[in-house]
Amino acid sequence: MSTSDDIHNTTATGKCPFHQGGHDQSAGAGTTTRDWWPNQLRVDLLNQHSNRSNPLGEDFDYRKEFSKLDYYGLKKDLKALLTESQPWWPADWGSYAGLFIRMAWHGAGTYRSIDGRGGAGRGQQRFAPLNSWPDNVSLDKARRLLWPIKQKYGQKISWADLFILAGNVALENSGFRTFGFGAGREDVWEPDLDVNWGDEKAWLTHRHPEALAKAPLGATEMGLIYVNPEGPDHSGEPLSAAAAIRATFGNMGMNDEETVALIAGGHTLGKTHGAGPTSNVGPDPEAAPIEEQGLGWASTYGSGVGADAITSGLEVVWTQTPTQWSNYFFENLFKYEWVQTRSPAGAIQFEAVDAPEIIPDPFDPSKKRKPTMLVTDLTLRFDPEFEKISRRFLNDPQAFNEAFARAWFKLTHRDMGPKSRYIGPEVPKEDLIWQDPLPQPIYNPTEQDIIDLKFAIADSGLSVSELVSVAWASASTFRGGDKRGGANGARLALMPQRDWDVNAAAVRALPVLEKIQKESGKASLADIIVLAGVVGVEKAASAAGLSIHVPFAPGRVDARQDQTDIEMFELLEPIADGFRNYRARLDVSTTESLLIDKAQQLTLTAPEMTALVGGMRVLGANFDSSKNGVFTDRVGVLSNDFFVNLLDMRYEWKATDESKELFEGRDRETGEVKYTASRADLVFGSNSVLRAVAEVYASSDAHEKFVKDFVAAWVKVMNLDRFDLL
């Protein structure tokens, strides 16, 4: 413990007394704000993936750069790489096919259809936590093997595209015909902060399958891609794993047939690695020492590589031809009887007790072994529904090949959005229902057509609130994670969206707009819905004394009901939309956190979110036409009244009940209730970051800036799914 003499002595020498200890003096060290207030609102989620972290700069155009790529030259190089075994990570049977397939699968397999997050679309496997997940052991080696190819082709191919293409080439080089490949995944340069991987604090914590249905989680254990291959909570029971398998694959939007095809197809090639106890394996890449240079899981068991490799701790080879495509997975599954055993690492697996030694050793041609399977592989035989599908694939290998090709394509492209985002020479021509297909455009409105339509909308009798509400309801379904939803397609007029509670008021405007569309015959309903919002915003700005032009880009089309997967679109129904002051359930997070979640899905910044909420309130765009947050006496006028009155100290706020979801703003002197508000309103005065933005818009000189910012953010949301404008 230092004394005053110590301080005096160091001061006398000219040294700062506070720089002598062992405290971390680096930027960001020390107790953080979140340490003090762990429930602090995550406004920072709206700032991720900015150009400040992008070394390529904001002018970089990946689609343009990809067009310069020697695509088939790249595939040729990948094919050669598959059999160029490296001494620092030798290839099993001289082929990296199984490793690259696993890399692609585990990159894409983090996708969750419930919120559209995860997936392979951003190359997130390069970053924590995914680069160090227990289920991704040794995939650091796969990515490092790809580096010379990435280095050669530079920015003409993103890491995200390269990971998936490498998996495709691995399948093709093993004799399998894939369904196709669509490029277009753009890299990001930092980890996704918005993905909820779960609340557990320890790796491989077990989750009950029923819990997965209530949360946007894609795995039964923290740190796994899908399920524990040893059965739920290491139970070793194939039948009990069925529920977990259905839950996890179902959360990706896969049905039973796709699930069986993916498991069997993924386990037709390659092997698992469990040569010895996992206690020999060192820290993951994020925890490894600096000299490991981004690699992790260094093993001290034997050579640590090749025949001595330890990955999952399981030691399983499924087929007689682990580098060539076959139907041996199903043949072995049903031909032999299986007994539970353990790998050299002690992991639970199964061995074909009555089989001869027909499986080749990956490194010693003189050795053979019996077929082995994972606990979850046997689920495909013992679960009644999975068994029916598996036996059909056993007897019809072509049906299996077709099912796997389509399921693999879906797995690896599910988070890319509509097919219009795909680029490259191997994009399949067929439209698939999970791509949310759209018809070809049939309208090409001229500038005069648009002017005429705007007059018709303005004279329709619809209020500013109705015009703005219907446009927002159509466009705000967009999800930045998987690029689903949005105004293109006018699916607001179709099932299930037209029946959502949140859209009850908005859809009342649809018959009027549908009539205008039918009578004019000049534009799609999708365009007219967005144009209605344009008219509403321009009228509201004019009423506020500002003449503005809201940009509008025609070209949207109208989807048909048969192009709309109702079950998958049900997942886009919001449990909350703070922009419309809507909340369906109170058992999920806080209202203000759900507002941030919605804004993040809409790819909004904090200022954009703030401007939109403030504008939506004064335009009277609440889903139920309530007065919550409508801090103005001139509804329908695009003013900054929301911010002015929210920050006015004449009013004090009190919750109306114990839920503290709704509040009354009373005059401090008279006690009169002046306004009512939700948490999605008051957060702009309570949260220090959002209040700082709100203060800008509440200033006396901010009205014109606010209107311009609102219009810019509004147009951004309306065009989020206009990939044709990129």
Curated annotation (Swiss-Prot):
Annotated positions for site Transition state stabilizer: R102
Q: What class of enzyme is it?
A: oxidoreductase
- Transmembrane portions of the chain: none
The GO cellular component terms are: cytosol
For this chain, the Swiss-Prot or TrEMBL PTM comment says: Formation of the three residue Trp-Tyr-Met cross-link is important for the catalase, but not the peroxidase activity of the enzyme.
Outline the segment boundaries, as ranges, of region: Disordered. 1-33
Keyword Transport assigned to the entry: answer is no
Q: Locate the cross-link: Tryptophyl-tyrosyl-methioninium (Tyr-Met) (with W-105).
A: Y226-M252
Q: How is the cofactor bound?
A: Binds 1 heme b (iron(II)-protoporphyrin IX) group per dimer.
> According to its UniProt record, which reaction does this protein catalyse?
H2O2 + AH2 = A + 2 H2O; 2 H2O2 = O2 + 2 H2O
Output the Pfam families linked to this UniProt entry: peroxidase
State the similarity comment: Belongs to the peroxidase family. Peroxidase/catalase subfamily.
HAMAP family for the chain: Catal_peroxid
This protein is called: Catalase-peroxidase
**Could you tell me which species this protein originates from?**
Shigella boydii serotype 4 (strain Sb227)
